[in-house]
Every structure is written in structure tokens, then in C-alpha cells.
Amino acid sequence: MRLTRRAALILGALAPLPLRAETREKLLLVLPPEDVAPHDPGPGAYDRPERLAAVRRALARSEFVTAARAETPKASLHALLAVHDSTYIERLRAASPSESVMRLGPDVVMSRGTFDAALHAAGGAVLAADAVMQGRARSAFVATRPPGHHALPDEAMGFCFFNNAAIAARHALALDAERVAILDFDAHHGNGVQRIFWSEKRVLYASTHQMPLFPGTGAISEQGEHGNIVNAPLAKGDGGEVFAAAWRERIFPALEAFAPDLLILCAGFDGHRHDSLAGLRLEGQDFRALTLRLRDFAEKRCNGRIVSLLEGGYRPEDLEACVPAHVGALADA
């Protein structure tokens, strides 16, 4: 099924990157425009607009005043089709309600602004990957909302509509990246990313996540067609020491052997001890410590190239603490 002409026009094209071509910014912060209609699933939703407001407050802190900033453009149709089926994209567009909300599944709700918000999230991921791969920024953090790592090529799930990390990785591979590592520290396993790249030897997907927990994937035995999937499940109640050990003992050795040209982080903060959607016991300092180690790896092995994409984290108070801990480590602030 082909997209209608109107849908293609709505999807638009990526805007030019507003960075100085002759410089390499230390840190790029990418946020959706203030005037974009919000993705608002309604009262009681976990992924509510207050999450993005908390991230905006966190990134307005004085330590980030020198960071380069850009607004998310809408993702191009070409970028979306690198991961998602055209029939699925059209189905999402057609399902967009003009008012109130539309429930597509038990954990997927669309409001009037959802489709545009999802386009901006995916477009921000592509913009950041482009900036980092083209040498205009060393690292980038994108306030991607709605999140993306559960989204399948033809199905929305787990609050996710477009798979932002997968779209960014495909874009990087289309440039001059030979190998891309997608590293996921969300409390929930990124089943969408894993499925998309199960048979892709140029992409390593590695994840720590709580098990058992939604979506039910992410066992150690799930290793991909080329051994390019590394899962390190955590148990309910695990804290910073177990989290750090899983990265040190399982993921970093695989990362060293893979030798990526770019790191894409699925930065989920729902492992924080106060988050009710999981049962891990992490603190802001645990996310900072991991980010510092990832930054050091990137400096030594891939010219510092990191693109970090917001995934989970459902208490605005926790996001306001964890996001600056993570982004500050990216920027060495």
C-alpha cells in the first residue's frame, strides 16, 4: 500500500541542521519545538506531557548553557521507511484523532498531537545522528517523546510509535558508519530494536533490563543471527552494583570486540528506585557512572561519537534529576 499524497506531505523532509559547519560542538541538545501539539494520552497515563517539561527544566540548568541546541524536525518519509512498513505509517496517520484520544492497544494511545510528536522524535534522532557522524557535534542528547525502543516495523507498542534508535542507526549506516552499537539501559527490554536488527551484522544491540517484566523478551539466550545481540537481564530489586557489573562483565567486552563507529544510547531512567513501572533500585549516580564509562569508551574507540535518545522514566521528579546526571557526563560537566 502506498502512502497518500497528503500523508507524504505531512511527513515532510528533514530541515537543515542549524550548526556551524566549521566547528565540532562538544554537546548538542535536541528538543521538540515548544509550539508542537503535545502527545497527550490523557489522565492517568504514564507517558504524560509533564515528562518532557521536566526534561526541558533539567536542560535549562546553568551547566548546559554553552551546549549547542537544535529543534527536532519531522522525520522524512525516507528515514521512516528504512525501518517501518509504509502500510503501518499510513495506518498511524489515518488513526490520528481530531479530538480526544484513540486507543490502538492496551498500552498505545494516540491524541491529536501524537503523530506529529512521533515524527519529531524520529526526526530529532536522525538530526542528531547526522550531526555526530558528519563531525558537527561530538555527542548529542535528544528529548525523544514518545519513546521508541518497543516499536516494531509494523506495530506500535509499549508507548512507542516509531523506533527512534533503529531509525538513527539506519541513517548512520547510510552515511559512512560501518558498525553501530545500540546500548539500552531502560528497565524494559527493547524488543523492537532487537527484532529489527536480529540479522544485521553491522549493528550490535546490548541491553540491561529487568526480567521478568514487559515485554517479556531479552533472555541471555537471545543472541541474534550473528551473535550481535547481548542481553544482560537484571532481577527485581537489583541496584547499582549489579547494574554496573552487568555492563562491565557482559556488555563492555562485547562492545570492545565489536569496535563500533557510533554509540546510540536508549536512555531510559525507569530503573530509578522510585519509578513504579519497574522494580530496580538505581540512582542518578548509577546512570552518571555508566555514561562516564561509555563516554570514555567512545573517546578511545569511535572519536567520541554518541547519540543518546530518551526512552523511559515516568516520574518527572526522577527525570529532572537523572537527565542532567546523564547529559552532564556526556558533556563532562
Give the predicted meaning of each segment.
Residues 1-17:
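N-terminal secretory signal peptides and thylakoid transit peptides that target proteins
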Residues 24-169, 176:
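Metal-dependent C-N hydrolase catalytic cores
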Residues 41, 126, 130, 141-300, ...:
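Conserved alpha-helical scaffold segments that buttress catalytic/binding sites
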Residues 69-70, 261-266, 307:
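Short glycine-rich phosphate-binding loop at a beta-alpha junction
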Residues 301-305:
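A short helix->loop->beta-strand "cap" motif at the edges of active sites that frequently abuts
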Residues 329-333:
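A charged, well-structured terminal subsegment
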